[in-house]
Amino acid sequence: MASRLLRGAGALAAQALRARGPSGAAAVRSMASGGGVPTDEEQATGLEREIMLAAKKGLDPYNVLAPKGASGTREDPNLVPSISNKRIVGCICEEDNTSVVWFWLHKGEAQRCPRCGAHYKLVPQQLAH
């Protein structure tokens, strides 16, 4: 039994020695011709690349990310972007609620959800293209 373990360890040691170059330093093996596996930033193209570069700058040009939630008070309403003067908004009201309360939000002052009282305000938005 011990001889099998020693033979296995010897084979591993020989394999490790073969992996070293002539100078004794470990030989570096790359998986791709360019020096390794490319990162997501190096491999992305087109729209995906634009979104990744904008995200590094803290921008969200195509509204891919979830909107930042506010406290929903009159002083700090939830901001709803829109390209028109009105937009329909859905409020869940409570975390475990199974229905959505839909209401129209118009440009101007902040408006309240009819059920829970959370405030929403319509803000103008420019299209990315």
From Swiss-Prot:
Pathway named in the protein's UniProt entry: Energy metabolism; oxidative phosphorylation
Gene transcribed to yield this protein: COX5B
Alphabetical list of Pfam families matching this protein: COX5B (PF01215)
Family: Belongs to the cytochrome c oxidase subunit 5B family.
First and last residues of the transit peptide: 1-31
Subunit architecture: Component of the cytochrome c oxidase (complex IV, CIV), a multisubunit enzyme composed of 14 subunits. The complex is composed of a catalytic core of 3 subunits MT-CO1, MT-CO2 and MT-CO3, encoded in the mitochondrial DNA, and 11 supernumerary subunits COX4I, COX5A, COX5B, COX6A, COX6B, COX6C, COX7A, COX7B, COX7C, COX8 and NDUFA4, which are encoded in the nuclear genome.
Positions bound to Zn(2+): 91, 93, 113, 116
GO cellular component: mitochondrial inner membrane; respiratory chain complex IV
Record-level GO BP terms: mitochondrial electron transport, cytochrome c to oxygen
Keywords, ordered alphabetically: Acetylation, Membrane, Metal-binding, Mitochondrion, Mitochondrion inner membrane, Transit peptide, Zinc
Membrane topology field: Peripheral membrane protein
Alphabetized GO MF terms: metal ion binding
Main location: mitochondrion
Entry keyword Mitochondrion: yes
Organism in which the protein naturally occurs: Pongo abelii (Sumatran orangutan)
InterPro entries: Cyt_c_oxidase_su5b, Cyt_c_oxidase_su5b_sf
Modified residues (N6-acetyllysine): 68, 86, 121
UniProt protein name: Cytochrome c oxidase subunit 5B, mitochondrial
Function field: Component of the cytochrome c oxidase, the last enzyme in the mitochondrial electron transport chain which drives oxidative phosphorylation. The respiratory chain contains 3 multisubunit complexes succinate dehydrogenase (complex II, CII), ubiquinol-cytochrome c oxidoreductase (cytochrome b-c1 complex, complex III, CIII) and cytochrome c oxidase (complex IV, CIV), that cooperate to transfer electrons derived from NADH and succinate to molecular oxygen, creating an electrochemical gradient over the inner membrane that drives transmembrane transport and the ATP synthase.
Compartment(s): Mitochondrion inner membrane
